[in-house]
């Protein structure tokens, strides 16, 4: 992995690439301590371009990527194997826009769920996805797993709250559809293919979500 690290280091700042065992450990263990990852490198991009650059390098080096959000899952979905790179979205955590007229909020994948709820509340709106782990889970993980939560019977799963999505695809391409239209009949609804795919079809980087 040393050659991979050498190629990634110029693309990220000094907090963007973790290789020390002590620094990596929190990204390798899930909450129940039932599964333990084996990766030797964690990349922490802070922009969509950095995510794309990491994916491009991993394609070139034939390295598998394990996207990781808040690492709050209980089934080992974000745990890496030896030789894989953990890509943490925790630094990609900006709220890009709140559109009160359209009742939407556009957020990056690393936004913690409770921060989205609070931002909606400050705008006198409501975001219905609510989970026990909302203080530490990230919206990218909620989308990748199509999380439910306590309001699922009234408002539906997380996929029901999504109007637009942005993601980096396995070939390094950018999928960008953050228009936020509530009625959009233009072709395939590709964002719904990415939601619930747990990172297997792309790395979600941002989403436009419904507010109420």
Question: Model-predicted segments: where are they?
Answer:
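N-terminal flexible segment immediately upstream of the FAD-binding catalytic core
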Residues: 1-56, 73-103, 132
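Feature of Fe-S/electron-transfer and energy-metabolism proteins
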Residues: 23-26, 43-44, 49, 57-60, ...
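Soluble FAD-dependent oxygen oxidases
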Residues: 38-65, 141, 149, 173
């Amino acid at each position: 992995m040393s050659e991979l690290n050498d190629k990634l280091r110029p693309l990220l700042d000094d907090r963007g690439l973790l290789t020390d065992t002590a620094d990596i450990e929190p990204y390798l263990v899930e909450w129940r301590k039932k599964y333990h990852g084996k990766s030797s490198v964690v990349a922490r991009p802070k922009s969509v371009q950095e995510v794309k650059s990491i994916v491009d390098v991993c394609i070139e080096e034939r390295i598998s990527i394990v996207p990781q959000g808040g690492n709050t899952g209980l089934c080992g979905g974000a745990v890496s194997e030896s030789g894989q790179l953990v890509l943490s979205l925790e630094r990609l955590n900006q709220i890009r826009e709140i559109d009160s007229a359209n009742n939407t909020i556009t957020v990056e994948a690393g936004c913690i769920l409770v921060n989205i709820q609070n931002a909606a509340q400050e705008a006198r709106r409501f975001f219905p996805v609510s989970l026990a782990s909302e203080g530490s889970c990230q919206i990218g993980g909620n989308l990748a797993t199509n999380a439910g939560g306590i309001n699922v019977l009234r408002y539906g799963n997380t996929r029901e709250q999504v109007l637009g999505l942005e993601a980096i695809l396995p070939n390094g391409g950018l999928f960008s559809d953050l228009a936020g239209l509530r009625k959009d009949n233009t072709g395939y609804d590709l964002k719904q293919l990415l939601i619930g795919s747990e990172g297997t079809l792309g790395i979600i980087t941002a989403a436009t979500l419904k507010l109420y």
